Amino acid sequence: MTTLALVLAKLPEAYAPFAPIVDVLPVIPVFFILLAFVWQAAVSFR
């Protein structure tokens, strides 16, 4: 049980280098919505 607690405690340190990537992730769906508008503008909203 204590081993599991130690592993869980180490996880945030292990993922620390990825923090900047995680900060950007919520913005990705917005890019897809913008892409949809650009695509429709390119095909003249058929």
Swiss-Prot record:
Top-rank lineage group of the source organism: Eukaryota
Keyword Signal: no
UniProt cross-references to InterPro entries, sorted A to Z: PSII_PsbK, PSII_PsbK_sf
TM regions (residue ranges): 18-38
Alphabetized UniProt keyword annotations: Chloroplast, Membrane, Photosynthesis, Photosystem II, Plastid, Reaction center, Thylakoid, Transmembrane, Transmembrane helix
Bilayer topology term: Single-pass membrane protein
Cellular-component GO terms for this entry: chloroplast thylakoid membrane; photosystem II reaction center
Propeptide: 1-9
GO annotation, biological process: photosynthesis
This protein's record includes keyword Chloroplast: yes
Compartment annotation: Plastid, Chloroplast thylakoid membrane
Coiled coil stretches, renumbered: none
Main localization (coarse): plastid
Role according to the record: One of the components of the core complex of photosystem II (PSII). PSII is a light-driven water:plastoquinone oxidoreductase that uses light energy to abstract electrons from H(2)O, generating O(2) and a proton gradient subsequently used for ATP formation. It consists of a core antenna complex that captures photons, and an electron transfer chain that converts photonic excitation into a charge separation. Required for assembly and/or stability of PSII.
Subunit note: PSII is composed of 1 copy each of membrane proteins PsbA, PsbB, PsbC, PsbD, PsbE, PsbF, PsbH, PsbI, PsbJ, PsbK, PsbL, PsbM, PsbT, PsbX, PsbY, PsbZ, Psb30/Ycf12, at least 3 peripheral proteins of the oxygen-evolving complex and a large number of cofactors. It forms dimeric complexes. This protein is tightly associated with CP43 (psbC), one of the core proteins.
Family of this protein: Belongs to the PsbK family.
NCBIfam families assigned to the protein according to its UniProt record, in alphabetical order: PRK02553.1
Stated name of the protein: Photosystem II reaction center protein K
Originating species: Chlamydomonas reinhardtii
